[in-house]
Amino acid sequence: NETHKTSDMKSFISIFEIPATDISRAVDFYQAILDINIEKMEFPEMQMGIFPYEGQMITGVIMKAEGYKPSAEGVTIYLNGGDNLQIILDKIEDNDGKIIVPKSLHADESGYYAIFLDSEGNKIGLHSPN
């Protein structure tokens, strides 16, 4: 009888989905702030933007489909802000996002975080060591 221990996992997250009402606007926003290329895919019932996943442990997807509603409430995901999240944070407002919490030191001094609303109204965090 094989048991599954979560302590054996390399990451507790495998996929995250960010809801969008306008897939092109959302893809443009994340491409601009993260300086990445997001692959767009369209299906009859949904549109997707897939974050680069090669070499990543986690897959990120922007989703426009029934049942996907952008929200500033609920779970907050924190994107990797690289060495210094301020570089990404400086691009937020120029790309129709809104900074909610500026770069701040974590209470336990384990690094820095910031929180913003994306182009769709989702609350998203950034985290970095510096």
Locate the predicted segments by residue.
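N-terminal beta-strand motif that seeds the catalytic metal site of vicinal oxygen chelate
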Residues: 1-27, 75-77, 130
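Core segments of cupin and vicinal oxygen chelate
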Residues: 10, 17-58
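Vicinal oxygen chelate
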Residues: 13-21, 67-93, 112-117
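Short beta->alpha transition motifs characteristic of CBS
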Residues: 16, 107, 115, 127-130
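Conserved active-site tyrosine of GNAT-family acetyltransferases
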Residues: 26-30, 92, 121
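Short acidic/glycine-enriched loop/turn segments that link adjacent beta-strands
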Residues: 43-47, 107-112
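Active-site beta-strand termini and strand-to-loop segments that position acidic
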Residues: 51-55, 116-119, 129
